[in-house]
Amino acid sequence: KEENKIMEKGYLSLVLHAHLPYVRHPEYEDFLEEDWFYEAIVETYIPFINLFDKLALDGVDWRLTMSITPSLANMLIDPLLQERTVKHIERLIELAEKEVIRTQWQNEFNTVAKMYLDKFKNTRYVFVEKYGKNLINAFKKHQDTGKLEIITCAATHGYLPLMEVVPNAVKAQISIAVTSYTRLFGRKPRGI
């Protein structure tokens, strides 16, 4: 009977999508929209890299697909944004150090302040020392082991079906995305 039939195994694919609009303002010392970039590095990309590194260290057989948009990828290798990211992390460490002192007589708050101080110091270590401010290399390292599959998307993160009224625009979006990916990751993308 049908109910006794063994179900076939399949695959579930989780695809993480990493994107930020391109923001770079050398004309300003601080620019609010750039904070999104720094926060994404501290709160998302480095925690993922730490997880990938830990899985590799523990010998876990894992697979994940992640898209990194051309705008984000190019921001991640930009020297100005890399230096500003270091300054952002340094400010977080300074604030956390002050919080540890301020909360020294409040155990429950002090524990949290110390946790954040440790987290931000680890973030600085991973970003500056371990990966030389280049998170593309961190992601590429895991792609080169076959565990992480990095794909791209349209060059400006545009929705290609809506661009089909101008076929040359679609071709340009894909061509630029593939060129950017190849330059940064050393091979053509296997997906978009």
Where are these regions (language model features)?
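Carbohydrate-active enzymes and regulators
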Residues: 2-192
